[in-house]
Regions:
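Structured soluble/peripheral alpha/beta segments that form catalytic or ligand/cofactor-binding pockets
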Residues: 1-318
Length: 318
């Protein structure tokens, strides 16, 4: 129990890694995200599973890339689930999720004709909640509230893709969200989150809202100390060949302790979920980015959202 409490983020408790009571919004949502990259195999893994109980729908997106080339892809947004869905929200379609220890260990199992796996995630850092950065939607009234936390950890297990057995041992991430409410006000965001190693992690979430609000969430974890971001500058280069895809991001961040880092990122395999989810009307793309900080490589989330092509940012500053 003491180990579990060591990993609980600010503003949450042990029960928040379990399922949550369904809220009143028509598109109230609970979702689970798991991602890693194996540099030795150049293997990229990303899976997102969620439920909309009030709409009777579940969704699952799962991609496996090698060197940026898709080897397996599933994007299904219309699983039928009951409106009173309980713990079975962790197990529909081919994916089964199981919380072994809250905020410490999760198990992922998958059973489909081409892809099977059995993986465990073990946390190596305390989870980070957007409540810690005082994001307004975390404390909004019922019907507007939306909660989020994310966590760095270690993946182990096996995967079988088209008959090829693959041993997995890789640094990666997971995150959780529940509620919808204020997220409907999103008007674009850019997320960069990279564990270069257990001793160096950079987490940046730059968000714009339709009512004009902007907010920066994130942290630098370095030498066993984590501090919230104080400022960030993100310079984005868009691909000339792929109009909605980022080619490169140059980043400079400073945290509350005065530590500054300059890093760059480029996306590897890109997952385009734009206009697939029934509750969203933005261009939303996920990827694993290859990051560089002073010659050291790292691999982590690189996600971006925009509503119209004219709103694609070139520079974001906080």
């Amino acid at each position: 129990m003491s180990e579990e409490r060591d990993f609980v983020p600010v503003g949450l408790d042990l029960t928040d890694d379990d399922i949550h009571a369904i809220g009143p919004e028509p598109w109230w949502r609970e979702a689970w995200y798991f991602e890693f990259f194996d540099p030795a195999r150049r293997l990229q893994f990303q899976v997102y599973q969620g439920v909309f109980p009030n709409a009777g729908r579940g969704d699952l997106t799962l991609y496996v890339f090698t060197d940026g080339r898709p080897g397996y892809e599933l994007m299904k947004m219309d699983y039928a689930i009951p409106s009173d869905v309980g713990r079975e929200r962790l197990c529909f379609g081919p994916l089964k999720l199981e919380m072994l220890e809250p905020f410490v260990r999760w198990r992922l199992q998958y059973d489909s004709p081409r892809l099977q796996f059995d993986l465990t995630f073990r946390a190596i850092h305390r989870a980070f909640s957007w409540a810690e950065a005082k994001l307004w939607m975390e404390e909004a009234p019922v019907g507007e509230q939306s909660r989020h936390f994310d966590q760095v950890g270690w993946y182990e297990g096996w995967m079988n893709l088209d008959g090829e057995e693959i041993d997995i041992a890789a640094l990666g991430m997971r995150d959780r969200m529940w509620g919808w409410g204020a997220r409907a006000l999103w008007r674009g965001y850019l997320v960069l989150w990279v564990p270069f190693s257990p001793s160096l992690v950079v987490n940046v979430a730059a968000m714009n809202f339709a009512d004009g609000r902007r907010q920066l969430c994130g942290y630098i974890h370095q030498d066993r100390e984590r501090a919230l971001l104080r400022s960030a500058r993100l310079a984005i280069t868009w691909s000339e060949r792929r109009w909605k895809s980022i080619e490169r991001v140059e980043v400079r961040v400073t945290d509350a302790r005065g530590r500054s880092l300059a890093l760059s990122a480029r996306p590897l395999g890109i997952i385009d979920t734009s206009h697939h989810w029934p509750h969203r009307f933005d261009h939303l793309l996920f990827s694993i980015g290859e990051y560089d900080v002073q010659g050291t490589k790292g691999y982590g989330c690189l996600t971006w959202s925009f509503v119209t092509a004219d709103e694609r940012p070139s520079v974001i500053e906080f």
